[in-house]
A protein has these predicted regions:
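Catalytic core segments in nucleotide and nucleic-acid processing enzymes
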Residues: 1-115, 121
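N-terminal, leucine/charged-rich tether regions that mediate assembly and partner docking
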Residues: 119-128
Length: 128
């Protein structure tokens, strides 16, 4: 999204979670979501940190959605190609590692953790 304000969560929080939920229901494989924005609003990060969605029939789902700034995504994406490591597993592993601390951290700290993970993983796949 191009939004950077607190409106970001209001405009994108529900549709992104709904789309990921729909994909989970439609595909018999793991589903991961990336939310990309110029800058991630803290309230948006908090929405995805919880990652809860109720599908039809009040079926509770825990969604795997990680918010990344465009710069964070660019850094990781470019590093995969520079390191000749452009594989979907690297993006999946980035998402999974970013999620490891979401239940232990509040949104501001989780956003800092995500930044640390992006920097470390980008260096790793690039071979720096």
């Amino acid at each position: 999204t191009m939004s950077t304000s607190s409106r970001q969560e209001a405009m994108e929080g529900e549709p992104v979670r709904r789309h990921v939920s729909d994909a989970i229901l439609n595909y018999d494989k793991p589903v991961y979501g990336l939310f990309l924005a110029i800058k991630i609003d803290t309230n948006t990060a908090e929405t995805f940190r919880h990652g809860i969605w109720y599908a039809k029939g009040d079926v509770k789902q825990r969604l795997d959605i990680v918010p990344l700034s465009l710069e964070q995504f660019r850094r990781h994406f470019v590093s995969m190609f520079e390191g000749k490591q452009a594989r979907p597993e690297h993006l999946r592993d980035l998402i999974l590692q970013c999620e490891t601390e979401r239940d232990n951290l509040e949104a501001p700290a989780w956003m800092r953790y995500i930044e640390t993970v992006v920097v470390e993983r980008s260096s790793m796949v690039c071979g720096r």
